[in-house]
Amino acid sequence: MSLNITENESISTAVIDAINSGATLKDINAIPDDMMDDIYSYAYDFYNKGRIEEAEVFFRFLCIYDFYNVDYIMGLAAIYQIKEQFQQAADLYAVAFALGKNDYTPVFHTGQCQLRLKAPLKAKECFELVIQHSNDEKLKIKAQSYLD
């Protein structure tokens, strides 16, 4: 089946409109939430088993198809952190924080990455933000341990 130019333009316009209105590829392709949850389970399982390369493939897919899901972004960021790709991890943690609003876990992990990037002042700022603003007492204690 071949599409003519008008059909191609119509499809392109529909996809662009959907993306501009906040739709994800998951939405555009009508991928069910339970399928995304299953894929996340595989990614998480691979991560926990230390099969980082396989986990990365799944987390990348998840992020591409639903870039608003903080869990997917955190998963890929954690992969990058394990692979010592600290700048990429920190960048993704920043996105996760922006999407997650009041969860300071990504800020904590950004601080860890900044230490490995030899940016102790940036790391200190991250840990201080966690201590000042997080509601998670365990996370605050972890952050404080980096400052002591």
Locate each region found by the language model.
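TPR/TPR-like (Sel1-like) alpha-helical repeat modules
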Residues: 115-138, 144-148
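Short coil/turn and helix-start
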Residues: 30, 49, 118-119
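Alpha-helical adaptor scaffolds
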Residues: 33-105, 113
